[in-house]
Amino acid sequence: GSEMCIRDRLLAVVAFYLAFECLDWLSTRRIPFSEARFGRVWRVAHAVLSRHPFAGPFLVLMIAWAPTLIASLPGLFMGDTGAQIRQWFNYPNGTSDYLRLLNPNVLLNGHHPVVHTAIIGSCVQLGLSVFNSANAGLAIYTCAQFVITAACMAYSISSLRKFGVSMPVRGVALLFFAFMPMFSNYAALLTKDVFFADAFLVLLVQTVKLVACGLPRRDANAERVGEPRPVLFARHDWLLLVLGALGSTFLRNGGLVFPLAACVIAAAFCAWDAHAAHRAAKQDSAASTLRVPRLRWVGILAVLALCLVSNLSLIHI
């Protein structure tokens, strides 16, 4: 036992040493990733990561994760999964046995996020109604979660391009997500944590986008001359910010703290951008540069107010 422990520790130390040596070697001997040098490999990577920055990674993830989905159907259960399903159908479950319920005849409670319990319970109910099979309902939920998780991961990779991250780094990130079994297994896991992680990832990306709007940007996106520079925060990004904030709020008990922190941080940066734009407008006698940071600041406060009001409404229900 002790010999195996010592061996494992030595192997871990050697592995960390070799990993950092490899990183040092890559930093000193950087090979430019260009079309002239790599030809077909560069064109494939460019098509997947730059010409189709969202659809390309999304298809790669769906194809790479498909064997896990097929092997896992109707889904991988956690300890809480059965309890949530039984709650939705008002059957006795592990939480109803020890919680002091407001109404003993209503076993649905807030031990698990009620919104997620409603989602997975509704899918099972749909499977029973349409296909007369609870497994069919679980498969519907698993497939929907699988697609949404792949879409969120693909969106995070596509957003790296807007942040000026080079194509090789985005390619390595995509391959890591595609072939690390943890992510494909997680996408087929029937638990409340998966949808929350998806929503939190979108919220995190949108918050970084808002913060980065006022920062100088590296122009590392144009792999070919004449390519348009991507817009960092477009109109549809507000919808994604709302979805990420609401998802983080309702898919985790106490999850309101995450959009609260994100909106406060983003609002502080946007307020600073508005202050800087106001000073620049005084010097240049132009008010147009002041309008955009102020609108972003107001939009962030509106998203925060929406999360607060909707959370209070759910509590009263």
Task: List the model feature ranges, each with a label.
Residues T68, S72-F89, P293-I315:
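Juxtamembrane membrane-water interface segments immediately following transmembrane helices
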